[in-house]
Design a protein with these regions (language model features):
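Metabolite-binding pocket within alpha/beta catalytic cores that recognizes anionic/polar moieties
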Residues: 1-137
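Active-site rim beta-loop-alpha module in soluble metabolic enzymes
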Residues: 136-185
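Zn-dependent metallopeptidase/amidohydrolase metal-coordination segment
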Residues: 193-230
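His/Asp/Glu-rich mid-to-C-terminal helical/loop segments that flank catalytic regions of hydrolases
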Residues: 220-263
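Non-catalytic positions within long, well-ordered alpha-helices that form the structural scaffold/packing
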Residues: 72-75, 184, 203
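Generic hydrophobic/aromatic pocket-lining and core-packing "Φ" positions
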Residues: 68, 180, 196-199
């Protein structure tokens, strides 16, 4: 149980870390001052609120590179994210849990890589990555962490969709109804704003990454007007379940089966 793990999320899991200490991490991409650190038995656990204190940073302005690099510099090997997302599949309803297995990137202006041609990043095992780096994203989420999430949700008695295609848009606005129709035709099932570039950057730094999505609304044109208040309300209704899932994750032994994340 020695692997350091990180949880990236929002208020739904923040209360798990009341006794944690707050730390600040300097990175080449900026300082990250919102990380909280705690310990369960021999495992170090870090929590990073991606939107900053009091949900103050919109998705398109999050310093994703600083966030992920900070966790890397702390020795984190596994990242468990949580997301509030919209459903663009009528069979997946608000209140449902989904552990997605695929991503469609529809972002526009976010930095998507650490490797700009001149960057060198060194790893604990003595290896390094530098220059122009082309990585395999056939499976953008770690299969081992996905299985951990699926088992944890099932263990608390909740139903979980074990696959889904997360369409990540720029935000902070919600999508148009025409965009939702396009995403559906592309094979998307979920609409969100933050898994890109988190999953991409984590893979570049040889960290395993998966996310647990909670459906908070249907996509534009599938219901009446979407509001942020509605999203918050649904998430708050499931806060206890999200916390129980994270407790299961924190206290569980993690798979030693080799995945594609560190190759």
């Amino acid at each position: 149980m020695s692997d350091k793990i990180a949880i990236i999320g929002g208020s739904g899991v923040y209360d798990l870390f009341k006794k944690a200490s707050k730390i600040s991490v300097k990175t080449p991409y900026g300082k990250v001052e919102t990380i909280k650190k705690t310990k369960y038995k021999e495992r170090e656990i870090f929590f990073l609120p991606r939107h900053g204190p009091k949900h103050s940073v919109p998705p398109h302005l999050i310093n994703y590179k600083a966030n992920i690099f900070a966790l890397h510099s702390l020795g984190v090997k596994k990242i468990y994210a949580t997301n509030a997302v919209g459903s663009i599949d009528i069979s997946i309803k608000p209140g449902d849990f989904v552990v997605p297995d695929q991503i469609i990137d529809m972002t526009k202006v976010r930095p998507l890589t650490f490797f700009d041609g001149s960057t060198t990043i060194k790893f604990e095992d003595g290896s390094s990555r530098k220059g122009v780096v082309h990585l395999d994203y056939t499976e953008p989420y770690c299969i081992n962490l996905r299985n951990m999430y699926i088992k944890a949700v099932e263990d608390i008695g909740e139903m979980v969709y074990t696959k889904g295609v997360y369409v990540c848009s720029e935000g902070p606005r919600f999508e148009t109804s025409a965009e939702i129709i396009m995403y559906q035709k592309m094979g998307g099932t979920l609409a969100g704003m933050t898994t890109v570039p988190e999953a991409i950057l984590a893979r570049e730094l040889k960290m395993c990454y998966s996310t647990l999505c909670l459906i908070t609304n249907f996509g534009a044109g599938m219901q009446e007007k979407i509001t942020h208040e509605e999203v918050v309300e649904i998430f708050e209704q499931k806060t206890n379940q999200v916390k129980e899932v994270m407790k299961k994750i924190i206290s569980s032994e993690h798979s030693s089966v080799k995945c594609n994340c560190i190759s």
